[in-house]
């Protein structure tokens, strides 16, 4: 079965874009897929838009960068504009729910898209620091090719040292992952032009 998934994630520095990309890449690799990730920072680096490219396949991946993504994630106002070049007709645009006006301004009503109120959920139910893990869970749920356990193992590898210092962080990250995963599963195979969670 042919499988090749191209994901671009973008947000402000500090929003955890690179961490989310590393975790999904690690989880994919552990699940037996070929996976490559490459970071791309704005010219300002600090204070610029951070973009991560992830490519996952059953076959060897020659380069993680691509011109059009299957899924493109935008987590900030500047990221909505920054990822425009990677959004094609069939691309699913996943974005922070508070960016609806920005998305409409840049993409109109034509783009397949999914608004996820990840920041609101993180602030109201958990902690703002797990905002990116909610988005990660949404990606895992939408795509359906990874098990939550694979992602939990990747989280352990990435954040295990922090979990050891504060065991509550593990539970918080696992809850955020599960919450995002549930949202993604509900929206799996999103085909409508606009979907709100």
Where are these regions (language model features)?
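Active-site cofactor/cluster-binding pocket
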Residues: 1-197
